[in-house]
Protein backbone atom coordinates (compact mmCIF):
# COMPACT_ATOMS: atom_id res chain seq x y z
CA UNK A 1 0.00 0.00 0.00
CA UNK A 2 1.10 3.56 -0.69
CA UNK A 3 2.35 5.42 2.39
CA UNK A 4 0.06 8.44 2.58
CA UNK A 5 0.07 9.50 6.23
CA UNK A 6 2.12 10.28 9.31
CA UNK A 7 0.67 9.95 12.81
CA UNK A 8 1.72 12.17 15.72
CA UNK A 9 1.21 10.91 19.26
CA UNK A 10 0.74 13.99 21.45
CA UNK A 11 0.93 12.88 25.07
CA UNK A 12 0.00 15.85 27.25
CA UNK A 13 -0.52 16.62 30.91
CA UNK A 14 -4.27 16.05 30.93
CA UNK A 15 -4.94 14.00 27.80
CA UNK A 16 -3.41 11.72 25.18
CA UNK A 17 -4.04 12.52 21.53
CA UNK A 18 -3.29 11.06 18.13
CA UNK A 19 -3.39 13.25 15.03
CA UNK A 20 -3.14 11.93 11.48
CA UNK A 21 -1.52 14.21 8.88
CA UNK A 22 -1.45 13.74 5.12
CA UNK A 23 1.45 14.62 2.82
CA UNK A 24 0.29 18.25 2.59
CA UNK A 25 0.37 18.51 6.41
CA UNK A 26 -3.41 18.68 6.58
CA UNK A 27 -5.12 17.14 9.60
CA UNK A 28 -7.06 14.04 8.55
CA UNK A 29 -8.31 12.94 11.96
CA UNK A 30 -7.89 13.64 15.67
CA UNK A 31 -8.59 11.37 18.60
CA UNK A 32 -8.25 12.40 22.24
CA UNK A 33 -8.72 10.81 25.64
CA UNK A 34 -8.35 12.42 29.05
CA UNK A 35 -6.85 10.51 31.95
CA UNK A 36 -6.85 10.77 35.73
CA UNK A 37 -4.96 13.44 37.65
CA UNK A 38 -3.78 12.20 41.05
CA UNK A 39 -3.11 14.53 44.00
CA UNK A 40 -2.06 12.29 46.93
CA UNK A 41 -0.71 15.19 49.03
CA UNK A 42 -0.69 19.00 48.78
CA UNK A 43 1.75 20.03 46.04
CA UNK A 44 2.04 16.46 44.72
CA UNK A 45 0.86 15.53 41.21
CA UNK A 46 0.93 12.02 39.75
CA UNK A 47 -0.30 10.02 36.76
CA UNK A 48 -0.75 6.28 36.38
CA UNK A 49 1.80 5.21 33.71
CA UNK A 50 -0.42 2.31 32.63
CA UNK A 51 -3.34 4.70 32.13
CA UNK A 52 -1.09 6.98 30.07
CA UNK A 53 -0.21 3.98 27.90
CA UNK A 54 -3.82 2.74 27.66
CA UNK A 55 -5.11 6.17 26.66
CA UNK A 56 -2.34 6.74 24.11
CA UNK A 57 -2.59 3.32 22.48
CA UNK A 58 -6.39 3.55 22.24
CA UNK A 59 -6.39 6.96 20.53
CA UNK A 60 -3.78 5.73 18.06
CA UNK A 61 -6.12 2.93 16.98
CA UNK A 62 -9.14 5.23 17.05
CA UNK A 63 -7.52 7.96 14.94
CA UNK A 64 -6.95 5.55 12.06
CA UNK A 65 -10.41 4.02 12.37
CA UNK A 66 -12.07 7.44 12.27
CA UNK A 67 -10.26 8.32 9.06
CA UNK A 68 -10.81 4.90 7.49
CA UNK A 69 -7.05 4.43 7.17
CA UNK A 70 -5.28 1.08 7.15
CA UNK A 71 -2.11 0.91 9.23
CA UNK A 72 -0.16 -0.12 6.11
CA UNK A 73 -0.79 3.40 4.75
CA UNK A 74 1.11 4.99 7.67
CA UNK A 75 4.69 5.98 6.81
CA UNK A 76 5.78 6.71 10.38
CA UNK A 77 4.69 7.58 13.90
CA UNK A 78 6.21 10.53 15.77
CA UNK A 79 6.00 11.28 19.49
CA UNK A 80 5.73 14.54 21.40
CA UNK A 81 5.15 14.65 25.11
CA UNK A 82 4.77 16.51 28.38
CA UNK A 83 8.33 17.09 29.47
CA UNK A 84 10.07 16.27 32.79
CA UNK A 85 7.36 13.83 33.99
CA UNK A 86 9.23 10.86 35.47
CA UNK A 87 8.51 7.12 35.19
CA UNK A 88 10.57 4.23 36.60
CA UNK A 89 9.72 0.63 35.75
CA UNK A 90 11.07 -2.90 36.08
CA UNK A 91 13.15 -3.96 33.09
CA UNK A 92 11.93 -7.57 33.10
CA UNK A 93 8.21 -7.08 33.75
CA UNK A 94 7.60 -3.56 32.41
CA UNK A 95 5.72 -2.82 35.63
CA UNK A 96 6.08 0.73 37.02
CA UNK A 97 7.47 0.79 40.56
CA UNK A 98 5.54 3.98 41.32
CA UNK A 99 3.17 6.41 39.64
CA UNK A 100 4.58 8.92 37.17
CA UNK A 101 5.69 12.03 39.07
CA UNK A 102 4.41 14.94 36.97
CA UNK A 103 6.42 18.04 36.07
CA UNK A 104 4.11 20.18 38.26
CA UNK A 105 4.90 18.14 41.39
CA UNK A 106 6.87 19.97 44.10
CA UNK A 107 7.68 17.06 46.43
CA UNK A 108 11.42 17.05 45.69
CA UNK A 109 11.98 20.66 46.84
CA UNK A 110 14.07 19.49 49.79
CA UNK A 111 16.37 17.51 47.49
CA UNK A 112 16.94 20.68 45.47
CA UNK A 113 17.87 22.54 48.65
CA UNK A 114 20.36 19.79 49.51
CA UNK A 115 22.02 20.16 46.10
CA UNK A 116 22.22 23.92 46.59
CA UNK A 117 23.85 23.35 49.98
CA UNK A 118 26.44 21.18 48.22
CA UNK A 119 27.32 24.17 46.01
CA UNK A 120 25.96 22.62 42.81
CA UNK A 121 23.66 25.45 41.73
CA UNK A 122 26.11 27.13 39.36
CA UNK A 123 27.36 23.79 38.00
CA UNK A 124 23.78 22.80 37.15
CA UNK A 125 23.13 26.16 35.47
CA UNK A 126 26.32 25.99 33.41
CA UNK A 127 26.11 22.37 32.29
CA UNK A 128 22.39 21.62 32.01
CA UNK A 129 21.07 25.12 31.23
CA UNK A 130 18.46 24.65 33.96
CA UNK A 131 17.71 25.92 37.45
CA UNK A 132 17.80 23.71 40.53
CA UNK A 133 14.06 23.20 40.78
CA UNK A 134 11.75 20.23 41.47
CA UNK A 135 10.17 20.91 38.05
CA UNK A 136 12.88 18.78 36.40
CA UNK A 137 13.25 14.99 36.41
CA UNK A 138 16.50 14.32 38.30
CA UNK A 139 15.25 15.05 41.81
CA UNK A 140 12.03 13.13 41.08
CA UNK A 141 14.11 10.04 40.23
CA UNK A 142 16.02 10.36 43.49
CA UNK A 143 12.76 10.70 45.44
CA UNK A 144 11.43 7.43 43.98
CA UNK A 145 14.68 5.58 44.63
CA UNK A 146 14.77 6.90 48.20
CA UNK A 147 11.11 6.28 49.07
CA UNK A 148 9.88 3.20 47.20
CA UNK A 149 10.85 0.02 49.09
CA UNK A 150 13.76 -1.85 47.45
CA UNK A 151 13.85 0.59 44.51
CA UNK A 152 17.41 1.76 45.06
CA UNK A 153 18.71 -1.80 45.51
CA UNK A 154 16.95 -2.88 42.31
CA UNK A 155 18.32 0.13 40.45
CA UNK A 156 21.87 -0.69 41.53
CA UNK A 157 21.38 -4.28 40.32
CA UNK A 158 20.38 -2.92 36.91
CA UNK A 159 16.77 -4.07 37.24
CA UNK A 160 15.04 -0.68 36.82
CA UNK A 161 14.72 1.72 33.91
CA UNK A 162 13.96 5.43 33.91
CA UNK A 163 12.25 7.38 31.20
CA UNK A 164 10.35 10.53 30.50
CA UNK A 165 7.00 9.92 28.80
CA UNK A 166 8.49 9.62 25.30
CA UNK A 167 10.77 6.81 26.49
CA UNK A 168 7.91 5.01 28.25
CA UNK A 169 5.75 5.11 25.10
CA UNK A 170 8.63 3.88 22.91
CA UNK A 171 9.26 1.02 25.34
CA UNK A 172 5.60 0.02 25.27
CA UNK A 173 5.17 0.42 21.50
CA UNK A 174 8.23 -1.77 20.85
CA UNK A 175 7.25 -4.31 23.53
CA UNK A 176 10.35 -3.57 25.57
CA UNK A 177 12.87 -3.65 22.74
CA UNK A 178 13.81 0.05 22.73
CA UNK A 179 14.94 2.22 25.67
CA UNK A 180 15.67 5.57 24.04
CA UNK A 181 15.05 9.29 24.44
CA UNK A 182 16.01 12.34 22.39
CA UNK A 183 18.12 15.38 23.34
CA UNK A 184 15.14 17.71 23.85
CA UNK A 185 13.72 15.45 26.56
CA UNK A 186 17.09 14.49 28.02
CA UNK A 187 17.86 18.20 28.41
CA UNK A 188 14.92 18.55 30.85
CA UNK A 189 16.11 15.90 33.30
CA UNK A 190 18.74 17.93 35.21
CA UNK A 191 21.12 15.06 34.36
CA UNK A 192 22.13 15.89 30.78
CA UNK A 193 25.14 17.96 29.80
CA UNK A 194 23.87 20.11 26.95
CA UNK A 195 27.41 20.86 25.73
CA UNK A 196 28.78 17.31 25.50
CA UNK A 197 25.26 15.96 24.77
CA UNK A 198 25.77 13.15 27.26
CA UNK A 199 24.62 12.17 30.74
CA UNK A 200 26.52 14.14 33.38
CA UNK A 201 28.51 11.83 35.69
CA UNK A 202 28.91 14.45 38.44
CA UNK A 203 25.16 15.04 38.68
CA UNK A 204 24.38 11.32 38.58
CA UNK A 205 26.76 10.86 41.51
CA UNK A 206 25.30 13.81 43.41
CA UNK A 207 21.80 12.32 43.11
CA UNK A 208 23.00 8.71 43.50
CA UNK A 209 21.33 7.62 40.25
CA UNK A 210 22.83 4.55 38.48
CA UNK A 211 23.69 5.37 34.86
CA UNK A 212 22.35 1.96 33.76
CA UNK A 213 18.80 3.23 34.42
CA UNK A 214 19.06 5.95 31.81
CA UNK A 215 17.92 5.65 28.19
CA UNK A 216 20.21 5.95 25.21
CA UNK A 217 20.02 9.43 23.68
CA UNK A 218 19.43 9.43 19.91
CA UNK A 219 18.76 12.35 17.55
CA UNK A 220 15.25 13.83 17.48
CA UNK A 221 14.92 12.94 13.80
CA UNK A 222 15.73 9.21 13.77
CA UNK A 223 14.11 5.81 13.37
CA UNK A 224 14.11 4.23 16.84
CA UNK A 225 12.21 1.02 16.21
CA UNK A 226 8.95 -0.28 14.79
CA UNK A 227 5.48 -1.15 16.01
CA UNK A 228 2.31 -2.83 14.84
CA UNK A 229 -0.99 -1.10 15.56
CA UNK A 230 -3.16 -3.48 17.59
CA UNK A 231 -0.77 -6.24 16.51
CA UNK A 232 -1.96 -6.02 12.91
CA UNK A 233 -0.53 -4.90 9.58
CA UNK A 234 3.10 -4.28 8.74
CA UNK A 235 5.72 -2.81 11.05
CA UNK A 236 5.50 1.00 11.22
CA UNK A 237 8.66 3.02 11.93
CA UNK A 238 8.72 4.96 15.20
CA UNK A 239 10.64 7.98 14.03
CA UNK A 240 10.90 11.45 15.49
CA UNK A 241 10.66 12.57 19.13
CA UNK A 242 10.62 16.00 20.73
CA UNK A 243 9.36 17.44 23.99
CA UNK A 244 6.19 19.44 23.52
CA UNK A 245 7.66 22.95 23.39
CA UNK A 246 10.56 21.97 21.13
CA UNK A 247 8.12 20.09 18.89
CA UNK A 248 6.05 23.26 18.57
CA UNK A 249 9.21 25.23 17.72
CA UNK A 250 10.01 22.73 14.95
CA UNK A 251 6.37 22.59 13.82
CA UNK A 252 6.60 26.36 13.31
CA UNK A 253 9.86 25.74 11.38
CA UNK A 254 11.85 27.98 13.73
CA UNK A 255 15.09 26.33 12.67
CA UNK A 256 17.35 29.38 12.32
CA UNK A 257 18.88 31.67 14.97
CA UNK A 258 16.53 34.50 15.96
CA UNK A 259 13.36 32.61 15.06
CA UNK A 260 10.91 32.35 17.95
CA UNK A 261 7.51 30.98 18.83
CA UNK A 262 5.00 31.70 21.57
CA UNK A 263 2.46 29.09 22.64
CA UNK A 264 -0.51 30.81 24.28
CA UNK A 265 -2.16 28.42 26.72
CA UNK A 266 -2.98 28.63 30.42
CA UNK A 267 0.46 30.22 30.55
CA UNK A 268 2.68 31.15 27.62
CA UNK A 269 5.79 29.25 26.53
CA UNK A 270 8.33 31.18 24.48
CA UNK A 271 11.35 29.64 22.77
CA UNK A 272 13.94 31.33 20.58
CA UNK A 273 16.32 29.31 18.43
CA UNK A 274 19.95 30.34 19.04
CA UNK A 275 21.50 27.96 16.49
CA UNK A 276 24.65 26.11 17.54
CA UNK A 277 25.25 28.56 20.39
CA UNK A 278 24.18 27.57 23.91
CA UNK A 279 23.49 31.01 25.36
CA UNK A 280 23.64 31.39 29.12
CA UNK A 281 20.93 33.83 30.14
CA UNK A 282 21.51 36.73 32.50
CA UNK A 283 17.75 37.30 32.71
CA UNK A 284 16.58 34.08 34.33
CA UNK A 285 15.76 32.25 31.09
CA UNK A 286 16.52 28.57 30.60
CA UNK A 287 19.05 27.35 28.05
CA UNK A 288 17.72 24.24 26.35
CA UNK A 289 18.10 21.99 23.33
CA UNK A 290 16.12 22.46 20.12
CA UNK A 291 16.09 20.78 16.69
CA UNK A 292 17.78 22.26 13.62
CA UNK A 293 16.85 22.10 9.95
CA UNK A 294 18.74 18.82 9.38
CA UNK A 295 17.48 17.25 12.61
CA UNK A 296 20.73 18.22 14.33
CA UNK A 297 20.97 19.68 17.82
CA UNK A 298 20.32 23.40 18.03
CA UNK A 299 19.99 25.42 21.21
CA UNK A 300 17.23 27.70 22.42
CA UNK A 301 16.36 30.14 25.14
CA UNK A 302 13.12 29.36 26.94
CA UNK A 303 10.89 31.39 29.20
CA UNK A 304 7.34 31.09 30.43
CA UNK A 305 4.54 33.44 31.41
CA UNK A 306 2.68 32.01 34.40
CA UNK A 307 -0.65 33.73 33.74
CA UNK A 308 -1.74 33.77 30.10
CA UNK A 309 -5.12 32.23 29.41
CA UNK A 310 -5.45 31.78 33.17
CA UNK A 311 -5.90 35.57 33.40
CA UNK A 312 -8.89 35.33 31.09
CA UNK A 313 -10.29 32.46 33.16
CA UNK A 314 -10.02 34.77 36.18
CA UNK A 315 -12.10 37.42 34.39
CA UNK A 316 -14.73 34.77 33.69
CA UNK A 317 -14.78 32.65 36.85
CA UNK A 318 -13.89 35.07 39.66
CA UNK A 319 -15.05 38.45 38.33
CA UNK A 320 -17.88 37.31 36.06
CA UNK A 321 -16.97 39.95 33.44
CA UNK A 322 -17.30 37.54 30.51
CA UNK A 323 -19.14 34.30 29.79
CA UNK A 324 -16.55 32.85 27.43
CA UNK A 325 -12.92 33.58 26.61
CA UNK A 326 -13.92 34.45 23.05
CA UNK A 327 -15.98 37.39 24.41
CA UNK A 328 -12.80 39.28 25.30
CA UNK A 329 -12.07 40.35 21.73
CA UNK A 330 -15.53 41.94 21.38
CA UNK A 331 -15.32 43.90 24.64
CA UNK A 332 -11.68 44.95 24.17
CA UNK A 333 -12.47 46.30 20.72
CA UNK A 334 -15.31 48.49 22.03
CA UNK A 335 -12.80 50.96 23.51
CA UNK A 336 -9.90 52.78 21.86
CA UNK A 337 -7.49 51.93 24.68
CA UNK A 338 -7.45 50.87 28.34
CA UNK A 339 -8.01 54.43 29.58
CA UNK A 340 -4.70 54.13 31.44
CA UNK A 341 -5.62 50.86 33.17
CA UNK A 342 -2.93 48.19 33.59
CA UNK A 343 -3.49 44.71 35.01
CA UNK A 344 -0.41 42.89 36.32
CA UNK A 345 -1.64 39.29 36.82
CA UNK A 346 1.03 38.29 39.35
CA UNK A 347 -1.41 35.95 41.09
CA UNK A 348 1.36 33.41 41.77
CA UNK A 349 4.26 35.84 41.63
CA UNK A 350 6.24 36.81 38.54
CA UNK A 351 8.43 34.50 36.49
CA UNK A 352 11.24 35.42 34.09
CA UNK A 353 12.76 37.92 33.76
CA UNK A 354 11.69 39.12 37.24
CA UNK A 355 11.58 35.89 39.29
CA UNK A 356 9.70 37.52 42.15
CA UNK A 357 7.54 34.98 44.02
CA UNK A 358 6.33 37.70 46.40
CA UNK A 359 4.79 39.96 43.74
CA UNK A 360 1.00 39.95 43.72
CA UNK A 361 -1.59 40.85 41.13
CA UNK A 362 -2.87 44.41 40.92
CA UNK A 363 -4.96 46.78 38.81
CA UNK A 364 -3.51 50.24 38.30
CA UNK A 365 -4.82 53.45 36.77
CA UNK A 366 -8.47 53.07 37.73
CA UNK A 367 -10.53 56.25 37.48
CA UNK A 368 -14.25 56.91 37.69
CA UNK A 369 -14.41 56.49 33.91
CA UNK A 370 -12.90 52.98 33.90
CA UNK A 371 -15.35 50.26 32.92
CA UNK A 372 -15.53 46.55 32.17
CA UNK A 373 -14.22 47.00 28.63
CA UNK A 374 -11.07 48.73 29.86
CA UNK A 375 -10.34 45.99 32.41
CA UNK A 376 -10.91 43.22 29.85
CA UNK A 377 -8.66 45.00 27.36
CA UNK A 378 -5.99 45.46 30.05
CA UNK A 379 -6.15 41.72 30.80
CA UNK A 380 -5.52 40.83 27.16
CA UNK A 381 -2.76 43.40 26.87
CA UNK A 382 -1.08 41.95 29.99
CA UNK A 383 -0.48 38.69 28.12
CA UNK A 384 1.28 40.57 25.32
CA UNK A 385 3.29 42.72 27.74
CA UNK A 386 4.55 39.68 29.65
CA UNK A 387 5.49 38.02 26.35
CA UNK A 388 7.39 41.17 25.34
CA UNK A 389 9.27 41.08 28.65
CA UNK A 390 10.53 37.60 27.74
CA UNK A 391 11.25 38.38 24.10
CA UNK A 392 13.28 41.45 25.08
CA UNK A 393 15.28 39.30 27.51
CA UNK A 394 15.92 36.73 24.77
CA UNK A 395 17.12 39.41 22.37
CA UNK A 396 19.49 40.87 25.00
CA UNK A 397 20.86 37.44 25.94
CA UNK A 398 21.30 36.09 22.42
CA UNK A 399 22.29 39.22 20.52
CA UNK A 400 19.92 37.99 17.80
CA UNK A 401 17.41 40.25 16.09
CA UNK A 402 13.89 38.85 16.32
CA UNK A 403 12.86 38.13 12.72
CA UNK A 404 9.19 37.39 13.44
CA UNK A 405 7.08 35.75 16.11
CA UNK A 406 5.30 32.50 15.25
CA UNK A 407 2.28 31.85 17.46
CA UNK A 408 0.11 28.88 18.40
CA UNK A 409 -2.24 27.75 21.16
CA UNK A 410 -5.86 28.52 21.93
CA UNK A 411 -5.56 32.29 22.37
CA UNK A 412 -4.18 32.90 18.87
CA UNK A 413 -7.76 32.92 17.58
CA UNK A 414 -8.08 36.31 19.31
CA UNK A 415 -7.21 38.84 16.59
CA UNK A 416 -7.08 41.73 19.06
CA UNK A 417 -4.43 39.99 21.17
CA UNK A 418 -2.35 39.02 18.14
CA UNK A 419 -2.45 42.56 16.74
CA UNK A 420 -1.50 44.08 20.09
CA UNK A 421 1.34 41.56 20.40
CA UNK A 422 2.67 42.75 17.03
CA UNK A 423 2.22 46.40 18.03
CA UNK A 424 3.96 46.20 21.40
CA UNK A 425 6.89 44.02 20.24
CA UNK A 426 7.32 45.87 16.93
CA UNK A 427 7.60 42.60 15.05
CA UNK A 428 5.36 40.72 12.64
CA UNK A 429 3.24 38.01 14.28
CA UNK A 430 2.52 34.96 12.13
CA UNK A 431 -0.48 32.73 12.86
CA UNK A 432 -0.35 29.34 11.09
CA UNK A 433 -3.24 27.70 9.28
CA UNK A 434 -2.68 24.53 11.33
CA UNK A 435 -2.47 25.59 14.97
CA UNK A 436 -1.71 22.02 16.13
CA UNK A 437 1.96 22.87 15.83
CA UNK A 438 3.17 20.59 18.64
CA UNK A 439 1.77 17.51 16.92
CA UNK A 440 2.83 18.88 13.53
CA UNK A 441 6.42 19.16 14.78
CA UNK A 442 6.44 15.49 15.80
CA UNK A 443 4.91 14.55 12.45
CA UNK A 444 7.51 16.60 10.55
CA UNK A 445 10.39 14.94 12.44
CA UNK A 446 8.96 11.46 11.83
CA UNK A 447 8.25 12.15 8.16
CA UNK A 448 11.73 13.55 7.54
CA UNK A 449 13.35 10.56 9.25
CA UNK A 450 11.73 8.08 6.83
CA UNK A 451 11.85 10.23 3.68
CA UNK A 452 8.11 10.95 3.61
CA UNK A 453 9.24 14.56 3.28
CA UNK A 454 12.66 15.39 1.90
CA UNK A 455 13.71 18.59 3.68
CA UNK A 456 12.66 21.58 5.74
CA UNK A 457 12.57 23.49 2.45
CA UNK A 458 9.75 21.22 1.30
CA UNK A 459 7.98 21.65 4.65
CA UNK A 460 7.93 25.42 4.23
CA UNK A 461 5.38 24.89 1.48
CA UNK A 462 3.25 22.77 3.82
CA UNK A 463 3.27 25.02 6.90
CA UNK A 464 0.98 27.76 5.61
CA UNK A 465 0.38 31.07 7.38
CA UNK A 466 -3.26 31.93 8.06
CA UNK A 467 -2.72 35.59 8.91
CA UNK A 468 0.09 38.14 9.23
CA UNK A 469 -0.24 40.75 11.99
CA UNK A 470 2.02 43.72 11.28
CA UNK A 471 2.93 46.43 13.82
CA UNK A 472 0.47 49.28 13.49
CA UNK A 473 1.52 51.89 16.08
CA UNK A 474 4.40 54.36 16.09
CA UNK A 475 7.49 54.10 18.26
CA UNK A 476 6.48 56.88 20.67
CA UNK A 477 3.13 55.26 21.43
CA UNK A 478 4.81 51.87 21.89
CA UNK A 479 7.36 53.33 24.29
CA UNK A 480 4.67 55.16 26.28
CA UNK A 481 2.49 52.05 26.64
CA UNK A 482 5.39 49.82 27.65
CA UNK A 483 6.73 52.37 30.14
CA UNK A 484 3.31 52.30 31.81
CA UNK A 485 3.50 48.51 32.03
CA UNK A 486 7.01 48.61 33.51
CA UNK A 487 5.86 51.12 36.11
CA UNK A 488 2.89 48.91 37.03
CA UNK A 489 5.14 45.85 37.39
CA UNK A 490 7.57 47.79 39.59
CA UNK A 491 4.71 48.76 41.89
CA UNK A 492 3.54 45.15 42.32
CA UNK A 493 7.03 44.32 43.58
CA UNK A 494 7.42 47.12 46.12
UniProtKB/Swiss-Prot annotation:
UniProt activity-regulation remark: Inhibited by fructose 1,6-bisphosphate (FBP).
Chain residues that bind ADP: 13, 17, 266, 309, 410, 414
Stored Gene3D superfamilies: 3.30.420.40
UniProt binding sites for sn-glycerol 3-phosphate: 13, 83-84, 135, 244
InterPro entries from the UniProt entry: ATPase_NBD, Carb_kinase_FGGY, Carb_kinase_FGGY_CS, FGGY_C, FGGY_N, Glycerol_kin
Residues that hold ATP according to the record: 13-15, 266, 309, 313, 410
Transferase keyword on record: yes
Transmembrane segments: none
GO biological process, alphabetically ordered: glycerol catabolic process; glycerol metabolic process; glycerol-3-phosphate metabolic process
Superkingdom per UniProt: Bacteria
Keywords, comma-separated and alphabetical: ATP-binding, Glycerol metabolism, Kinase, Nucleotide-binding, Transferase
Catalytic activity from the UniProt record: glycerol + ATP = sn-glycerol 3-phosphate + ADP + H(+)
Enzyme class name: transferase
GO molecular function list: ATP binding; glycerol kinase activity
Record pathway: Polyol metabolism; glycerol degradation via glycerol kinase pathway; sn-glycerol 3-phosphate from glycerol: step 1/1
SUPFAM superfamilies: Actin-like ATPase domain
EC number: 2.7.1.30
Cellular component terms (Gene Ontology): cytosol
Annotated binding of glycerol, by residue: 83-84, 135, 244-245
HAMAP family in UniProt: Glycerol_kin (MF_00186)
UniProt function note: Key enzyme in the regulation of glycerol uptake and metabolism. Catalyzes the phosphorylation of glycerol to yield sn-glycerol 3-phosphate.
Family: Belongs to the FGGY kinase family.
Protein name as catalogued: Glycerol kinase
Organism: Shewanella sp. (strain ANA-3)
Gene: glpK
